[in-house]
From Swiss-Prot:
CDD domains named in the record: DEP_DEPDC4, RhoGAP_BRCC3-like
Stretches assigned to the DEP domain: 27-118
Protein name: DEP domain-containing protein 7
InterPro entries, per database record: DEP_dom, WH-like_DNA-bd_sf, WH_DNA-bd_sf
Swiss-Prot/TrEMBL GO biological process terms: intracellular signal transduction
Length: 515
């Protein structure tokens, strides 16, 4: 007999190519490409590794590429590695102490830069991205960035790789069937933004018990002023403060020190007068790194140490910060990290970026191997003391909890600005319910109650009661602080009320129990 052909494999190369192309197109249109500063130098038309993973993961989940299966973040990282090997994008050449260094392995990090190959990339002079991968505005009038030496890749043709597309997608356990969801979600950007916000709030309510919801659902603080840059205001080119900012950038590029680079990055958020003071102060310093660092650190402390400085974690979600600190006190670090990630998704992009830069600087400056910042306390405590008021609203929060929260954010600053996988899943389920025409207000994701029949309710009550009584009897029996007389009295009372459980607990030892 002849074995019939596997009809499920028919057309698989086409489906795999289609999925692959959609992932690439989505990454190119959704990831934030702009001029970035890294290791003392500015690189044009780049995107962050962590943001690429966010975009790819969101596309995989929302498009149901893997069906309803949970997609861990490491699979999106693996797919980004395959995209880099396929020459869709490359790691940006960075100079570390004068030597060219190119990453051979894709890194899910906010410090790793990548650049698309053979793609018209808008400059960031007119671009602004809010969120990570789902709210993007771009200017298409900028000159394109092209790489002439790489011509193997094209959006309209299969990618030439050492591995077949089927192997790449198969290793990720992806479903290669084209679905209507993958073709076109048909949803407006406004609706998408609202869905992301709703599901972010929903997930926060699952992690943290909030006494009041009005501030979270309705309260919005006015966004902070934009960065001081020629991109947002061309007239700045003719001001002295703009020249001072450019002097600081040039100074940073000339120094082989990540501490100085992180400090100068924070200067972009400072008012003009402080920037002018820093620029002129550097000119008066001797050519010693320690003097440069003392000057930059002092100016940052002066700016962020103001008593009336508005904290970067917005006050209208103070209850979230209080809840996160409680999670940390109880040792629930994973839930605390996810709660902070969700909280940051509710903030404006400007505050989020300023906080990211400040935490990066604090982590570098807080190292014991860096320049001593305070005569009596270690660097880690010095930066915590100097910048805590600029991060979280500490008037109503106990000082110990504020310190714990700030130090935790310093330690986790690399992961703090990533999108949790659970949020991706909630958004995916919500989109699926809308596309299928089911109730859009139906709660998706994890639920904590279900309808029980009368019989199930009785069985649950009996089981729970038995378990609690067993625990109570065990506590009485094993409590070494009770006197023998008191223990006999309590055991006697328990035996009179629940003899069956008493006999089951002691078994053959019941003859040795004096009650």
């Amino acid at each position: 007999m002849h074995t019939p052909p596997d009809t499920g494999m028919a057309g698989k190369p086409f489906r795999a190519t289609y999925i692959w192309t959609n992932i690439i197109n989505n990454l190119q249109t959704q990831v934030e490409v702009k001029r970035r500063r890294h290791n003392l130098k500015i690189y044009p038309d780049c995107f962050l590794g962590s943001e690429a993973v966010d975009v790819v993961l969101a596309h995989i989940i929302q498009s149901k590429v893997c069906g309803d299966a949970e997609v861990p973040r490491f699979k999106a990282v693996r797919l980004c590695q395959a995209l880099m090997e396929a020459r869709v994008f490359e790691a940006v050449d960075t100079k570390v102490f004068g030597k060219e260094k190119r990453q051979a392995k894709f890194e899910d990090s906010s410090c790793s830069l990548y650049r698309f190959l053979n793609r018209q990339t808008p400059s960031t002079s007119g671009s602004e991205t809010i969120g990570s991968g789902y709210n993007t505005q771009r200017n298409t009038n900028s000159p394109p960035f092209q790489r002439m030496e790489d011509s193997a890749y094209s959006n309209n043709s299969p990618v030439k790789t050492d591995k077949s597309l089927e192997d790449v997608l198969g290793n990720l356990n992806m479903n290669t069937t084209i679905t209507p969801q993958m073709m076109n979600l048909g949803l407006s950007q406004e609706l998408m933004d609202e869905i992301w916000r709703q599901q972010t709030v929903l997930r926060l309510l699952q992690l943290i018990e909030l006494p009041l919801l009005e501030s979270l659902l309705e309260g919005q603080e006015s966004p902070r002023p934009p960065l001081h840059s020629m991109d947002s205001d061309p007239d700045l080119l003719y001001t002295s403060s703009y020249l001072d900012r450019e002097i600081l950038k040039a100074f940073s590029e000339a120094q082989a020190d990540s501490w100085l680079s992180a400090a100068v990055d924070c200067q972009e958020f400072l008012p003009d007068q402080l920037v002018v003071d820093v620029s002129r102060g550097l000119a008066k310093c001797e050519e010693e790194t320690s003097q440069y660092k003392q000057l930059l650190y002092g100016v940052l402390v002066q700016h962020y140490g103001q008593s009336d400085y508005p904290p970067l974690l917005t006050n209208h979600v103070f209850d979230i910060h209080s809840g996160v600190s409680e999670l940390l006190v109880n040792g629930k670090c994973e839930q605390a990290l996810e709660s902070l990630q969700l909280c940051l998704k509710l903030q404006d992009s400007r505050s989020r970026e300023e906080l990211r830069r400040l935490l990066r600087f604090m982590a570098l400056a807080g190292s014991p191997h860096q320049i001593k910042l305070h005569k009596e306390i270690e660097n880690r405590m010095a930066v915590k003391r100097a910048f805590s008021n600029a991060i979280v609203y500490g008037t109503k929060l106990a000082k110990g909890k504020v310190d714990l929260l700030v130090l935790f954010m310093m330690d986790k600053h690399h992961d703090l600005f990533k999108i949790p996988v659970t949020l991706h899943k909630l958004v995916s389920d919500k989109l699926a319910s809308i596309i299928k025409g089911t109730d859009p207000d139906r709660i998706t994701g994890t639920t904590y109650c279900r309808h029980l029949s009368g019989k199930e309710f009785v069985e649950t009550v009996q089981k729970t009661t038995r378990e609690e009584l067993w625990t109570l009897l065990k506590t009485i029996h094993e409590n070494t602080k009770l006197s023998l007389k008191e223990k006999r009295r309590l055991l006697g009372q328990f035996y009179k009320g629940h003899p069956e459980i008493f006999v089951q607990y002691f078994g053959n030892r019941i003859s040795n129990i004096y009650i």
